[in-house]
A protein has these predicted regions:
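Soluble non-cytosolic domains of exported or imported proteins
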Residues: 45, 72-76, 91, 147-151, ...
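Secondary-structure end/capping motifs
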Residues: 234-328
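C-terminal motif of bacterial Sec signal peptides marking the signal peptidase cleavage site
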Residues: 17-21
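Bacterial N-terminal signal peptides that target proteins for export
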Residues: 1-10
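Pocket-lining segment of extracytoplasmic ligand-binding domains
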Residues: 178-277
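Conserved C-terminal helix/tail region of periplasmic/extracytoplasmic solute-binding proteins
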Residues: 311-364
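Short, glycine-/small- and polar/acidic-enriched structural segments
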Residues: 28-174, 182-185, 189-195, 211-212, ...
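Bacterial signal peptide processing site
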Residues: 23-25
Length: 364
């Protein structure tokens, strides 16, 4: 497989030393290949299946790109990797990006990937927690203590006047079966994860109840970002990457089962030991179909807005982050997302991609 995955549960300093010199400096010349070091905070799974599609269907290759996925395990390391130059493009919700901007990082949001919010707090259906006020004294399970979802949960609970480490605490529990067991076993009172994780838990027979605020529910989620310097020097590379991901997302939305089967082939370790492919598919389809609703909100194919940010949504994020105490000073999120590459992202034959998805078979 051409996507080379590196698991890096290290800080950006370690990333810089291990990957220094790998980052591309300019678009690939005719007939050559540009390598992108791409930071991903979570392991490959249904939520990231469009990445596998972009590789397997040749969408990256068509753009002269090879993508190295660097799995960091948290969002903070990705921001630090972009700052250090050890990563070219990163994937994370906006919270840690906005935090870094207040500390002087010159970052640019380049592709609005998940167009609606994925994160919320979740409890078991029979939990005594009935409102945000009831989280006083709670232990909240996080994928890690460097995840953007921890910041989001703190923002949600701030609306009820609750303060972390005073009124409630966090505990790293991972994701998947480990997180679910921590919740069911009483190690934590709630989880702060995301849509596909929750959908998989419910598909396996664990009903949940969710807590958020109207303000948070209206925000977009995962975004692709880079340094302002990389964006200025590598426009063609960013355009190609975004166009490939737009195609892959459209393919996935058209035929989610094909996207998952492609992912299983490209990443065999996404199959849970003891599960048949059909059993795994039944769980992952529920999760992916929930994610597709967020990936395609506003019908970006019809509107030609793959990767685009709405100015009001950017302002809403900056306001929420400041009001919730995620950042301690105002940032200009609109200026950080100039939309320079959106026209190029949408410059492809959508009908051809849809046909390709509908016609896909496992024999390909």
């Amino acid at each position: 497989m051409n996507i080379r995955r590196t698991t890096a549960l290290l800080a950006a300093v370690a990333l810089a030393s291990s990957l220094a010199g790998c980052a591309s400096e300019s678009p690939a010349a005719e007939g050559s290949t540009t390598t992108i070091e791409f930071g991903l905070p979570t392991n490959m799974g249904a939520n990231n299946s469009p990445m596998a599609v972009a590789e397997a269907m040749g969408y990256f290759a068509e753009e002269g790109l090879e993508v190295d996925i660097v799995v960091t395990g948290d969002s903070t390391s990705i921001v630090q990797g972009i700052d250090s130059g050890s990563l070219d493009i990163g994937s994370t919700p906006p919270e840690p990006i906005l935090q870094a901007m207040t500390k002087g990082s010159d970052l640019q949001l380049v592709y609005n990937y998940i167009r609606k919010q994925t994160g919320s707090l979740a409890v078991l259906a029979d939990s005594p927690i009935q409102s945000l006020d009831d989280f006083r004294g709670a232990v909240i399970g996080q994928a890690s203590l460097g995840t953007s979802n921890m910041l989001l949960s703190e923002g949600i609970l701030a609306s009820a006047g609750l303060t972390p480490d005073v009124d409630y605490s966090h505990l790293a529990v991972g994701t998947g079966a480990a997180a679910l067991q921590a919740l069911k076993g009483g190690q934590v009172d709630a989880l702060s994860l995301w849509d596909t994780e929750y959908a998989a838990f419910e598909a396996q027979g664990t009903p949940l109840r969710y807590f958020t605020t109207d303000e948070v529910a209206s925000l977009f989620s995962t975004t692709y970002f880079t340094s302002a310097e990389y964006a200025a020097d590598n426009a063609a590379t960013i355009e190609g990457f975004g166009r490939a991901m737009a195609k892959a997302t459209l393919f996935t939305a058209t035929n989610p089962e094909a996207a998952l089967r492609i992912m299983y082939d490209e990443y065999p370790d996404t199959l849970v030991a003891g599960n048949s492919i059909d059993d795994q598919l039944a769980i992952d389809l529920v999760a992916l179909e929930r994610r597709i609703e967020l990936l395609t909100a506003g019908d970006p194919q019809a509107s030609g807005t793959w990767g685009a940010y709405d100015e009001s949504a950017l302002k809403a994020w900056a306001t929420f982050a400041l009001d919730a105490g995620i950042i301690d000073s105002a940032v200009d999120a609109v200026a950080a997302a100039p939309g320079t590459f959106v026209e190029a992202y949408n410059d492809f034959d959508g009908d051809a991609v849809i046909s390709e998805a509908k016609d896909w078979s496992a024999a390909e």
